[in-house]
């Protein structure tokens, strides 16, 4: 069984924690070229392309300018990303065995790096999937990565029993030929919703928290059977058998 999650927009380049081992991203060469291409844009252009304010644009302009230098140093992906999902995974208390299990069974999508393992060393960046780089033929990052990642992704899932737990955001499917993925492996997508006035509603912050907590649950408990996910409970969220299917696991909360 393999789990995959999305990258986060917020990142840090520092951590007091040391991972037991480190690894190099599989698509490091492509990531470096992508970063070099991004370094050609001005801060004003990045503000528009990334849809951010001028401060964040200036910060990422400098990140891309310094990407190929020795400073800042790289950090393991699971520690570098600091979004809500990653805060809830909380790798700061992982044992070496937890990190190794995550390295073997968790994958992280990235518009810059393509597909990452948790201990892959990465640098801070900001990227969007719809950005079109001239050096990449003017196609979006979604279309650039799709033919590169699909076969690798399917092969890795099959090597881990042919079951994928999809905890990534919806847009990340566009990095792959998702129709092929669903044809060749079993995809199970957990969702997290709240009952409000008799209707199920998605509260984004809760959904992100639960994705992180479920990822942590999988890693800490070495989950290999998707049926064991049904035992996940967190802050009132629990498996809702009446609104779940073989490919869609709903965890609901009574508000």
UniProtKB/Swiss-Prot annotation:
Q: Determine the domain of life of the protein's source.
A: Bacteria
- Name of the protein described by the UniProt record: UPF0246 protein BVU_0413
Q: Name one GO cellular component term.
A: cytosol
Cite the InterPro entries for this sequence: YaaA
Kindly give the Pfam families that the UniProt entry links to this protein: H2O2_YaaD (PF03883)
Which family is this protein grouped under? Belongs to the UPF0246 family.
Name a single GO biological process.
Answer: response to hydroperoxide
Return the HAMAP family for the record: UPF0246 (MF_00652)
Query: Taxonomy-wise, where does this protein's organism fall, top ranks first?
Result: Bacteria, Pseudomonadati, Bacteroidota, Bacteroidia, Bacteroidales
NCBIfam families listed in its UniProt record: PRK02101.2-5 (NF002547)
């Amino acid at each position: 069984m393999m789990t995959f999650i999305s990258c986060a927009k917020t990142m840090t380049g520092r951590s007091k924690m040391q991972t037991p081992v480190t690894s190099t991203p599989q698509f490091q060469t492509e990531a470096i070229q992508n970063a070099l291409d991004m370094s050609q844009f001005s801060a004003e252009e990045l503000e528009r392309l990334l849809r951010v304010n001028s401060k964040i644009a200036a910060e990422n302009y400098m990140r891309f300018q310094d990407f190929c230098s020795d400073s800042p140093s790289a950090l393991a992906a699971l520690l570098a990303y600091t979004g809500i999902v990653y805060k809830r995974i909380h790798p700061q208390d992982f044992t070496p065995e937890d990190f190794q299990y995550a390295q073997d069974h968790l994958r992280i999508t990235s518009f810059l790096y393509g597909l990452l393992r948790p201990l892959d060393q990465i640098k801070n960046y900001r990227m969007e999937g719809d950005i079109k780089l001239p050096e990449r033929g003017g196609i979006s990052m979604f279309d650039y990565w799709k033919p590169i990642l699909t076969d690798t992704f399917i092969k890795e899932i099959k090597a881990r029993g042919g079951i994928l737990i999809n905890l990534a955001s919806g847009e990340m499917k566009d990095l792959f030929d998702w129709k092929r993925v669903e044809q060749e492996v079993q995809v199970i997508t957990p969702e997290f919703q709240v009952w409000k006035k008799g209707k199920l509603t998605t509260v984004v912050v809760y959904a992100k928290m639960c994705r992180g907590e479920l990822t942590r649950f999988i890693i800490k408990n070495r989950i290999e059977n998707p049926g064991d996910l049904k035992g996940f409970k967190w802050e009132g969220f629990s498996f809702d058998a009446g609104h779940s299917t073989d490919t869609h696991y709903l965890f609901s909360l009574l508000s």
